[in-house]
């Protein structure tokens, strides 16, 4: 019987001191696509949070207290909601409970832990070179394998295809 052998092309990355793993399937180009989408969504979420902060500021503009507990809680809620949305997006890209793995020590100390936007931004920034390496090389190999120059006489220019 014939047997088809296929490279799994899985990349394992330790995400904490306990060596919990993020496993990337480098054959799945949609992971890279979702990561790019995540990056775009974070920018949108950041802009939305700024607008919500302005709304909170306007809502409490007539209160003279320097420190108003309700206003403070409203600001904190905006930050918490933004962080939770970013965590949901990260989990969509890298798998369920990805953030819990990365911040495992924090969750062990406090099960209700929510990382702030800075910690999440640093996490995303640390993932960029990993994603570029994992998927950039794959994209380059694919382009080299199927580039127009290697197809020789079957290659047509854009103008030839239009005619």
Label each region the model flagged.
Residues 8-10, 84, 88:
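Residue-level detector of functional hotspots within protein domains
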């Amino acid at each position: 019987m014939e047997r088809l052998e296929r490279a799994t092309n899985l990349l394992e990355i330790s995400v904490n001191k306990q060596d919990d793993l993020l496993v990337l399937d480098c054959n799945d180009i949609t992971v890279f696509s979702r990561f790019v989408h995540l990056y775009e969504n974070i920018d949108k979420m950041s802009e939305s949070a700024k607008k919500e902060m302005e709304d909170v500021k306007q809502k409490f503009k007539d209160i003279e207290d320097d420190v108003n507990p309700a206003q403070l809680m409203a600001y904190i809620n905006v930050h918490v909601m933004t962080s939770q949305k970013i965590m949901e997006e990260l989990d969509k890209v890298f798998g369920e409970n990805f953030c819990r793995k990365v911040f495992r020590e924090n969750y062990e100390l406090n099960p209700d832990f929510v990382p702030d936007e800075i910690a999440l931004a640093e996490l995303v920034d640390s993932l960029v070179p990993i994603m570029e390496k994992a998927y950039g090389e794959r994209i380059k190999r694919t382009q080299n394998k199927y580039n127009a120059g290697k197809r020789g006489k079957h290659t047509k220019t854009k103008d030839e295809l239009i005619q």
